[in-house]
Amino acid sequence: MTKAASGDSKSTLYCSFCGKSQHEVRKLIAGPTVFICDECVELCMDIIREEHKISFVKSKDGVPTPKEIREVLDDYVIGQDHAKKVLSVAVHNHYKRLNHATKNNDVELGKANILLIGPTGTGKTLLAQTLARIIDVPFTVADATTLTEAGYVGEDVENIILKLLQAADYNVERAQRGIVYIDEVDKISRKSDNPSITRDVSGEGVQQALLKIMEGTVASVPPQGGRKHPQQEFLQVDTTNILFICGGAFAGLEKIISARGQGTSIGFGAKVADPDERRTGEIFRQVEPDDLLRFGLIPEFIGRLPVIATLDDLDEKALVKILTEPKNAFVKQYVRLFEMENVGLTFTEDALMAVARKAIQRKTGARGLRSILEGVLLDTMYELPTYDGVEEVVVNAEVIEGRAQPLIIYAERRDKGGAA
């Protein structure tokens, strides 16, 4: 659509989709009575590419191949190549098993639930969420720390299946092919080596309660949630084909693994092991069932999680990529917020590195990146709507380190100053 700017000899053209003028964009393409800018064209291409990736060319089994699953995971999760490969193969095999369950009964394929082990903020939950989106199945996240044994204050394990059922709009058949992610599973480790001291209702007791639904049982789920009572009607959900992914940071597990691998050596030639010599993620790759047993998981629970995927620590380079590259990257989100005020936002390269360093120092991983950016931009976002003529805000390393305020560039006078 064409709009005339008052006082101009020529009419100014505007994008029919985003409303930006021809002076604000690189290119404006004309069509019959409409115009579209290069930015909107790029956005449309992103949407088409995304839909094309999600609606896969399926393998002959009707399930995305491991490589196709991996390609989509790469769009959302930076790094973690080993974990992506393990998860892609496990999920492909799981849904291939479901599709072939009724075709040939000679060999019964067992369910392979997955255990994700990795430091906090490395992408465990995001990986599970993305997998569910790729396969297009119901997905729910449960917090293991809120679960207790039946009969005690807290959530019953059946509430996990209720959440999955709600995610499937109470379609039982769809829910029975869904994915459940149980977070903080390391927090339900056995609290004491001696089980006779006291009843461990939130540790070993929860592990025992989870065994049946993870292996496969017909769970009686109260539709409204809450505790069961005799007069209540129940929905019957078969958990045999539900894929369970358990995740946790497993703080301290690396010491158990290192102690097993060190052995004993003495003499002048003996190598003295430095605990900081290897990154936590590297040590996790050597995990064995015995290590998880020593950590506090019971043998039966470990047996229900045959596939183990370990995640690596995120270094500075990986954190900078997380800030800028994914479709929903934090920097892109803040740039879009500032665009809504018609203001540009620029982070210098050294600023991004400073954010990454601060996240590593705090040991929060990718989870801490947003809070760092929020703290840095808080004053600017507070004052910005009241400013006139601001064209751009620039953030450098000094701003991230707290030694300066963001640089504010004005459109007309090009004045520079700090945010109040």
From Swiss-Prot:
GO molecular-function terms, A-Z: ATP binding; ATP hydrolysis activity; ATP-dependent protein folding chaperone; protein dimerization activity; unfolded protein binding; zinc ion binding
Entries under InterPro entries matching the protein: AAA+_ATPase, ATP-dep_Clp_protease_ClpX, ATPase_AAA_core, Clp_ATPase_C, Clp_protease_ATP-bd_su_ClpX, ClpX_bact, P-loop_NTPase, Znf_CppX_C4
Entries under PROSITE patterns matching the protein: CLPX_ZB (PS51902)
Keyword annotations of the record: ATP-binding, Chaperone, Metal-binding, Nucleotide-binding, Zinc
BP-aspect Gene Ontology terms: cell division; proteolysis involved in protein catabolic process
Subunit composition and interactions: Component of the ClpX-ClpP complex. Forms a hexameric ring that, in the presence of ATP, binds to fourteen ClpP subunits assembled into a disk-like structure with a central cavity, resembling the structure of eukaryotic proteasomes.
Described function: ATP-dependent specificity component of the Clp protease. It directs the protease to specific substrates. Can perform chaperone functions in the absence of ClpP.
Name of the protein this chain belongs to: ATP-dependent Clp protease ATP-binding subunit ClpX
Organism name: Phenylobacterium zucineum (strain HLK1)
